[in-house]
Amino acid sequence: MAKRILVIDDDKDILYILEIIFAEEGYIPILYETGTTVDQIKVLHPDLILLDVRITGFEKTGDQICAEIKKERELSNIPVLLVSAEIDLDQRALNCGANGFLNKPFDIEKLLAKVKEYTF
């Protein structure tokens, strides 16, 4: 069964590219251009979440959303990867309970390796 990857990023170009890449690799991409709520994530119940740290127009940062996800019993086992162009991403990921991080711009091979690691 195809794994569902929730991508939350305010960059339309990144969403478009990831949609193509993930679909070609056999995943089901679920794309959100703005932030989403924990309740919405409960309904979607993805197998992996790629979460931008800075989401324009949303009151919470990606790491705040990640922390909320990890506090929810039914969502806490879903792997979350933070994504950002920021340098200090490793510490932010650790602090919010994320499973890892990816720096922008993406290296597609590294991205797919991380995705496969968490969706095996």
Put a short name on every predicted segment:
Residues 26-35, 40:
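Short hydrophobic/Thr-rich beta-strand motif most characteristic of the beta2 strand and flanking loop
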Residues 44-55:
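Active-site beta3 strand of CheY-like receiver
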Residues 61-64, 86-103, 113:
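Alpha4 helix (beta4-alpha4-beta5 surface) of REC/receiver domains from two-component response regulators
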Residues 61-76:
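Short amphipathic alpha-helix used as the core "switch/output" element in two-component signaling
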Residues 81-83:
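Hydrophobic/aromatic residues positioned on beta-strands within the core alpha/beta folds
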Residues 107:
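Receiver (REC) domain switch/active-site region of two-component response regulators
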Residues 111-120:
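Receiver (REC) domain switch/output surface
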